From Swiss-Prot:
The keyword Membrane does not apply. Disulfide bonds: none annotated. Catalyzes the S-methylmethionine (SMM) biosynthesis from adenosyl-L-homocysteine (AdoMet) and methionine. SMM biosynthesis (by MMT1) and degradation (by HMT-1, HMT-2 and HMT-3) constitute the SMM cycle in plants, which is probably required to achieve short term control of AdoMet level. Also able to catalyze the selenium-methylmethionine (SeMM) from AdoMet and selenium-methionine (SeMet). May play a role in phoem sulfur transport; such function is however not essential. This is Methionine S-methyltransferase. It comes from the Eukaryota. Its main location: cytoplasm. Keywords: Cytoplasm, Methyltransferase, S-adenosyl-L-methionine, Transferase. One of its GO terms (biological process) is methylation. GO terms for cellular component: cytoplasm. Homotetramer. GO terms for molecular function: methionine S-methyltransferase activity; pyridoxal phosphate binding. Belongs to the class I-like SAM-binding methyltransferase superfamily. It comes from Hordeum vulgare.
Length: 1088
């Protein structure tokens, strides 16, 4: 039944008034189409309107557009289509206020057409910027997807799209048109108003395919744009603007690609792992920029189709000319459609001004995520408050093996930073998870049943070798010639076997060839106490060479440390390894340990972690304690990186699928082996070490020199950015000038061009090298009473000569000039250690006058002064304590003794609130001391990613960034509140707290507990300040440092920079301990 002529005239009359009126009339028709009762009648009306103008051809359609503000016409889909299984054209309504199909959308559809038919069949598809819906409808018509969601931010096109859907889903009589599966277009297509993919996100719709022909609009303000480019051109544009990730976000926006970039990132969150995205890309920015938009976000791309279209004559491209003027980047235009050589924007602009016509490429790209689940995690992290980092993101890789390694790590790092608001407490022997993964890898791939306790983690192979030699301090050691490069020069030049005068505990190292028969001959002749060696490649294939080494070292009484770094493959198909074959069948003898330095990764050739394997509990415990004393710990980030590699090799395996074969027990070593050095032994027996918590009940650590406060988002952003960036320049990892400014602003210390600035993974590692320098000069190290116990024990471990400067509780355990002078009178070659401005562990402060007086006394006696600022930067009660000006202090000091010099030791983690992420530095100006320091070359140094991170954070601090300054103030306020609460709790529970003005710890005397008896599980005896640590730990799970650690009789140390929940539990433990020992109750105050 045809529509009445009156209905057609009434509809046209309603449309004639204006565009808004035409839209209103169309909406009224849509309402009738949506109602089943009036649907057929409304469809017949539209059919009649179309026929009214169809006879007049295109001219009549244009006349309808001008007169009635709409038109209904046919869009030809495929004139070459054979047969009748699909339509060759669609009928579409258009109104002036929406995007009308033109070259862009037709080119896009042609690109979609290049896909095989199966690519969309039965899939869930979203079209972004659907306009009047013709592509969504055409896609549904041709490929029979399960559902197509046509999305557009403009509500008017959505209404017209629904009309077009009814136009094509029903015939002219208003009857449904069914496809081969018995469905109509109404079953397959829906249209919604949506800002890009917000509709799908809000409704939790997962998509198989995302397609989009999104407008690209050039920046309308070339002056502002050129200013931005000019400011950034100092970054050298890193080969070209299109290849520099840090500026890429700007480029994408200015070229009109910003909307596509956002669509791609939104698409990552809703597309299925096997999903596909297809986008139109105008080629004006150049193919490099267009393709990098996808590549740097982790996509593999395929250019489906490319053609040229004319540049609209009314488009102003002067903005592009301005960018070219201020950069080396060149845009791509063509002269007319037939030109095949690209011309730049400036040439194109001049040609257009002279009446010429220019064109540009238009391409259709299909893109699919590589490692989609991991890339999704990365973008989920960036979306959670780290959007600024996305401009630095670069997931483009020429080598798939690099991508396979780096993308999973970035996903892991994103999850770790997202889940851990503060860095977790990890043992110094290595992160428990990492040691579990190493043990798991050895068990799964090499059938060696190790436990995490058998694995001790070191910053590097060189550090592991030196620390092991210091633990045993052998008179003679034979070391593989390939492994001596980082050993102290003194070890390589002394010759103890001549029995000449040599210092006690001096190690003599003899270089040895790696070939086993020659090495064995040396061992038999020289009878060393320790042998450190690797293995030649041809000898590592079988176990024979290893068995011979074990035998000869056992016979002569040598300890063996065997390096297998070159032979351990992190692969799912590792090659044969004779040492690991041996360990699969036999327990490692007690006199032998295995060493492996991990440097074989695809991404960072200089990122190293090492681990040692021992099955002797005495040895692996001592190695763990040695790393705690001499290094502090190994970089957590480095362990995460290699841990991720191990995890990838283990994640797909079914655990314990094969029963573990019985191993032969290790041979009993009848010959006496060298034990630990006397200084190491006495230190290990008396020092306090990390107490690991059990799985059932975690230990609350108030005994550690680190903060567990929440890590600010700015820190996490900088960490993540350091890994997502590629092509980082040397200048971006150079922290020298930033540290110079920091020490100038904070301490008035001038570190000019003559000063040497040395970086270390930890401040403790740098300090220990200074101790060795002191020993080399035959000096005496002077510690004030009430010094960080780790530092004192580290010096004792290496048998340094030390002396204590007396201090008093009523002066906050600060060094008094008279006491310092009296102590210096007694020694020659003095080295004075001063912790300040904040004293660790007491939390009191040295003023500028205080340090000036101390330096004056040191200068009089020609002492070397080590000023340790590592606990400073978080002073929360500095009223009346003037800021340091070391430059002025030193200029006022007159010393006739050339030995006087000042060394500044620092740690950035407190200054920059990077709890758990350490970066030590050392500033020296005495050239002879610098030379001595460099004679101990095994220092573990921060990786370039850490240097990039800390340079960014130092920039925020030095430039007094308001947000970053507020974060530091917030942490200071938190620490002040914690200190106040802790003092109140301690004093209410029978302790005499000394109080503090800065830092993260304070001292307190257990006055009410001394002499009291306590009997709990694992502890029985009378309490004193030495056993208070064990008593508290056994009875409550709270771990503090005893007076043995502080060095101050009767005073224990409490660290209070804990995670808020742990701090609350610590307060409860202190109260509970009082009840256990003294009886009665104590009020527990909550924490802020």
């Amino acid at each position: 039944m045809a529509a009445a002529a009156g209905d057609v005239e009434a509809f046209l009359a309603a449309c004639q008034a204006s565009g808004d009126a035409a839209y209103g009339a169309a909406k009224a028709v849509l309402e009738r189409l949506e109602a089943p009762a009036t649907r057929a009648e409304a469809r017949r009306l539209l059919g009649a309107v179309r026929r009214r103008f169809a006879a007049g051809g295109p001219a009549a359609g244009l006349e309808c557009f001008r007169t009635f503000h709409f038109r209904i016409h046919d869009v030809v889909l495929d004139p070459h289509l054979q047969g009748f299984q699909q339509r060759k054209k669609l009928t579409m309504m258009e109104i002036p206020s929406i995007f009308i199909p033109e070259d862009w959308s037709f080119t896009f559809y042609e690109g979609l057409n290049r896909h095989p038919d199966s690519i969309f069949r039965d899939k869930t598809v979203a079209e972004l910027g659907c306009g009047n819906g013709w592509i969504s409808i055409a896609l549904a018509e041709k490929w029979c997807p399960s559902k197509v969601y046509g999305l557009d931010i403009n509500p008017r096109p959505i209404k017209i799209a629904w009309i077009n859907l009814y136009l094509n889903a029903l015939d002219d009589d208003g009857l449904p048109i069914y496809d081969a599966e018995g469905k109509t277009l109404l079953d397959r297509v829906e249209f919604y108003e949506s800002d890009l993919l917000s509709y799908c996100r809000d409704n939790k719709i997962e998509l198989d395919r995302i397609v989009g022909c999104i407008p690209q609009i050039l920046n309308p303000n070339p002056e502002a744009m050129s200013k931005i480019v000019t400011e950034n051109s100092s970054e050298e544009f890193l080969y070209s603007l299109s290849n520099y990730c840090a500026l890429q976000g700007f480029v994408e926006d200015q070229f009109g690609l910003g909307l596509i970039a956002r669509a791609v990132e939104e698409g990552i969150s809703v597309i299925k792992p096997s999903g596909l995205m297809v986008f139109n890309m105008g080629g004006r920015p150049g193919q490099g920029v267009c393709e990098r938009l996808f590549l740097r976000r982790g996509f593999r791309i395929n250019k489906l189709w490319q053609t040229k279209i004319m540049q609209a004559a009314d488009t102003d491209i002067s903005a592009l000319v301005e960018i070219e003027k201020n950069s080396r980047h060149r845009f791509e235009f063509f002269m007319d459609l037939v030109g095949d050589q690209p011309v730049c924007a400036r040439t194109a602009w001049a040609y257009m001004k002279s009446g010429g016509r220019i064109s540009h490429a238009l391409s259709v790209y299909s893109c699919q995520l590589r490692q989609p689940n991991q890339v999704k995690k990365i973008f989920e992290f960036l979306k959670d408050g780290f959007h600024e980092v996305s401009s630095s993101l670069d997931l483009s890789f020429d080598d798939d093996s690099v991508a396979d390694e780096k993308i999973p790590f970035l996903a892991y790092l994103a999850s770790f930073l997202q889940e851990n608001k503060s860095n977790p407490c990890e043992p110094p022997a290595g992160c428990l998870n990492f040691r579990n993964l190493v043990a798991g890898f050895m068990k799964s791939y090499h059938h060696i049943p190790l436990t995490p306790d058998n694995v001790v983690v070191f910053p590097s192979r060189a550090v592991a070798i030196e620390n092991a030699l210091r633990l045993f301090s052998p008179g003679l050691a034979i070391v593989d010639e390939h492994l001596t490069r980082h050993l102290p020069k003194q070890w390589l030049t002394s010759l103890a076997i001549e029995e000449s005068n040599h210092a006690k505990d001096t190690v003599t190292v003899i270089e040895a060839p790696r070939q086993s028969d020659l090495l064995i001959e040396l061992i038999r002749k020289l009878k060393p106490q320790v042998v450190v060696t690797g293995m030649a490649q041809f000898e590592a294939i079988t176990s024979a060479a290893f068995v011979n080494l074990l035998s000869v070292t056992k016979d002569v009484g040598s300890r063996l440390l065997l390096d297998i770094s070159e032979h351990l493959e992190l692969s799912s198909l590792p090659s044969s390894n004779g040492v690991l074959k041996y360990l699969a069948g036999k327990t490692l003898p007690s006199h032998a340990a295995i060493l492996c330095g991990l440097v074989k990764n695809q991404v960072y050739s200089d990122l190293e972690v090492a681990f040692a394997i021992s099955e002797d509990p005495t040895v692996y415990k001592a190695l763990s304690q040695t790393i705690e004393l001499l290094e502090g710990h190994t970089s957590v980030i480095s362990q995460h990186y290699y841990g991720c590699l191990f995890h990838e090799l283990l994640a797909f395996q079914i655990g314990d699928r094969h029963p573990q074969q019985e191993r032969e027990p290790a041979e009993v070593i009848s010959k006496e082996m060298i034990g630990f050095s006397s200084s190491a032994m006495s230190t290990l027996e008396g020092a306090e070490f990390f107490v690991p918590g059990s799985m059932e009940s975690g230990v609350i650590h108030m005994d550690l020199d680190r903060s567990f406060l929440p890590v600010p988002s700015a820190v996490n952003a900088s960490i993540f950015e350091s890994f997502v960036r590629q092509n980082i320049t040397d200048s971006e990892t150079d922290v020298r000038s930033s540290i110079q400014q920091l020490v100038k602003d904070s301490y008035g210390f001038s570190a000019g061009g003559a000063s040497e600035i040395i970086y270390g993974n930890t401040c403790l590692a740098l300090f220990n090298k200074l101790v060795l320098c002191c020993m080399q000069e035959q000096g005496t190290l002077l510690f004030p009473l009430g010094t960080n116990g780790h530092y004192v024990n580290a010096a004792k471990f290496v048998n340094a000569t030390t002396l204590t400067i007396p201090t008093k509780a009523d002066s906050g355990f600060k060094i008094e000039p008279s006491a310092l002078a009296d102590t210096l009178e007694k020694v020659s070659q003095p080295w004075v250690y001063i912790s300040g401005p904040t004293i660790n562990p007491t939390g009191f402060l040295y003023s500028d006058d205080d340090i000036a007086e101390l330096l004056s006394v040191c200068a009089t006696y020609g002492a070397r002064v080590v000023i340790d600022t590592s606990s400073s930067g978080l002073e929360f009660q500095a009223t009346g304590c003037s800021q340091w000006n070391l430059e002025r202090c030193l200029s006022n000091v007159k010393s006739s003794k050339p030995s006087f010099s000042v060394v500044l030791l620092g740690e950035l983690s407190f200054e920059l609130t990077t709890a758990g992420l350490d970066f030590g530095f050392l500033i020296m100006s005495d050239s002879s001391l610098v030379d001595t320091f460099y004679s101990f070359p095994s220092l573990s140094r921060p990786h370039s990613t850490l240097k990039y991170t800390f340079r960014k954070l130092l920039g925020l601090k030095n430039q007094k960034d308001q947000h970053f300054s507020d974060l530091i103030l917030e942490q200071k306020e938190t620490l002040k509140n914690r200190a106040d609460q802790l003092i109140k709790m301690l004093e209410s529970c029978g302790w005499d707290a000394v109080g503090c003005h800065g830092g993260i710890s304070m001292l307190a005397k257990p006055t009410a507990y001394i002499g009291k008896s306590l009997k709990v599980d694992g502890f029985e005896g009378k309490l004193d300040s030495h056993n208070m640590r064990e008593a508290l730990l056994r009875s409550t799970g709270l771990c503090i440092s005893s007076s043995g650690w502080t060095g101050v009789p009767d005073y224990c140390r409490f660290s209070f920079a804990l995670e808020s929940g742990d701090f609350d539990r610590a307060m409860e433990c202190i109260a509970r301990f009082r009840e256990l020992v003294l009886g009665g109750g104590a009020k527990v105050n909550g924490s802020n």
